[in-house]
């Protein structure tokens, strides 16, 4: 089981805050409340953050490094997308409450900020308004990712090179 530590260096989050879309629209006080729930973990290049079929446990934000999204079918893995600093992932499985449908692997040594399912549920109980803002932002992020996937499919249909 991966170790997670409390996020103590909040300044490191502030430097990438503009890239973290699901934290948009919250006040400083609300953001500080969210920051208290965040943890951090490191992953070496090639290490899996989460695997297809596992129960989702966290929403991840990339603080340093790059993460690849891999889709697999019968032992064939295809890189669907690469995520960079400030990007979040893991929210689809977490919100849909289904096991992971893809795997995420560190493309280079990476540091991830994480929001656990337990912390998200605690936020729902403690501050429903902040919880609702986060859920709306995550839904918006998922809609963007769905559009990205639609674009990939459309380009594939037309034989256009797809940039990951």
Task: Report the location of each language-model feature.
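Cytosolic regulatory regions built on CNB/CRP/Popeye-like sensor folds
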Residues: 1-164
